[in-house]
């Protein structure tokens, strides 16, 4: 079994700053680095470092030759990559002192993929092979359809979310891997649990993985649901967290490992990646992950905790304007003190911080899915003024 990754290859220009720049602001960077990147390249590096046989297909520009060398040096087959006489795709990445990031992407050569090239690449693969995809290249819909027709298992990470995903035939996708915000945009739910319920109704044959940051990840396939706690890590750069998880997840599928093992290894690899700077350079090898795992600590979490977290999320989402810790303690039938400790244990935040994050998530959902003016959105989520800014959204929604 082989993995084909039809994915982006970018040049990442990474700027280290005290805080992420907002509208009208000029901030001096304390450090600037150039890294190989692109979600496609990162995920190929992750899958290859996880020991899987990976073939990367992409179009790179005149300034992107080193990207193919990076892939090759990490064990990926690059014989299917094309070169075009134009500038390569690139990303400008701001990373603040807490390791959080904001990213601007220029697609460049990533949008030069056409149907003829797709057909030529897919001719090298057969039924049962895996194909990994992200939303940074052209012809996504065509690639999914043709790969599905060949009997390949399609693994889609629908990131970054954009309008071109709205008409995808999700039933042709074998595995969807996305974060909570992406799940809400793609499936329409207001929480991870609600998104999973909607997925079961809309795409019952598709396995869904939702990554939840510090809360871990959840996998659903039919009636089977598996929760994986996050591993504790000192985050310095979260850029490659999702890509590391996706690449390791695909590698585990390629080896037909149990889903519980796949989730645990992918989560550990992701935790190691966020403790390092850069995108592709931060991704650990399988040997590193296996050696580190015995010493790594999982954040507390299980099915019961997932249900408790759902109750907390449902309470806050249903009471955005009036949610209080006292109200939550009454809802859970916990003491005020116990409710506060539970929120902190499950989310890594105080109740006030968690409620603010849920309000910001709700605000962003309204901004992206409606034409409501900001003043109305602000009032709807519980702010007396238009207090949520672009900086707050980027800082709090990961």
Predicted regions and their residues:
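Conserved phosphate-binding/catalytic region of the ribokinase-like
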Residues: 163, 193-300
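Short, Lys/Arg-enriched, Trp-marked, Pro/Gly-tolerant hinge/linker segments that flank
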Residues: 291-314, 318, 326-332, 345-353, ...
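Positively charged, low-complexity intrinsically disordered leader regions
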Residues: 1-23
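Substrate-binding N-lobe of the ribokinase-like
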Residues: 3, 23-90, 292
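Terminal helix-turn-helix DNA-binding modules in bacterial transcription factors
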Residues: 313-314, 318, 322, 345-384
């Amino acid at each position: 079994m082989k993995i084909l990754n039809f994915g982006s290859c970018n040049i990442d220009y990474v700027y280290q700053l005290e805080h992420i720049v907002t509208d009208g602001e000029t901030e001096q960077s304390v450090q600037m680095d150039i890294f190989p990147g692109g979600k496609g390249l990162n995920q190929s590096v992750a899958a290859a470092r996880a020991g899987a046989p990976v073939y990367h297909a992409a179009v790179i520009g005149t300034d992107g030759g080193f990207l193919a060398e990076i892939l090759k040096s990490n064990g990926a087959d690059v014989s299917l990559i094309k070169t075009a006489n134009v500038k390569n795709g690139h990303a400008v990445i701001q990373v603040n002192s807490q390791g959080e990031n904001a990213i601007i992407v220029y697609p460049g050569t990533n949008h030069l993929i056409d149907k003829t090239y797709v057909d030529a690449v897919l001719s090298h693969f057969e039924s049962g092979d895996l194909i990994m995809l992200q939303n940074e290249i052209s012809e996504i819909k065509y690639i999914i359809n043709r790969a599905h027709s060949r009997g390949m298992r399609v693994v889609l990470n629908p990131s970054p979310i954009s309008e071109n995903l709205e008409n995808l035939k999700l039933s042709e996708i074998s595995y969807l891997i996305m974060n909570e915000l992406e799940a809400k945009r793609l499936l329409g739910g207001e929480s991870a649990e609600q998104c999973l319920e909607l997925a079961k109704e809309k795409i019952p044959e598709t396995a869904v993985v939702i990554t939840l940051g510090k809360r871990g990840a959840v996998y659903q396939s039919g009636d089977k649901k598996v929760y994986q706690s996050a591993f504790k890590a000192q985050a310095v750069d979260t850029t490659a967290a999702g890509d590391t998880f996706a690449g390791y997840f695909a590698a585990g599928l390629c080896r037909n490992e149990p889903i519980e093992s796949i989730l645990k290894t992918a989560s550990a690899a992701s935790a190691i990646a966020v403790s390092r700077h850069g995108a592709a350079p931060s991704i650990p090898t399988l040997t590193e992950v296996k050696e580190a795992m015995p010493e790594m600590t999982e954040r507390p979490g299980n099915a019961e905790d997932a249900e408790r977290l759902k109750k907390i999320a449902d309470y806050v989402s249903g009471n955005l304007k009036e949610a209080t810790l006292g109200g939550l303690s009454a809802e859970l039938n916990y003491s005020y003190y116990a409710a506060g400790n539970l929120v902190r244990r499950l989310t890594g935040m105080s109740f006030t911080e968690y409620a603010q994050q849920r309000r910001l998530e709700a605000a962003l959902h309204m901004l992206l899915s409606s034409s409501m003016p900001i003043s109305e959105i602000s009032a709807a989520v519980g702010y007396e003024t238009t207090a949520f800014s672009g900086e707050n959204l980027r800082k709090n929604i990961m």
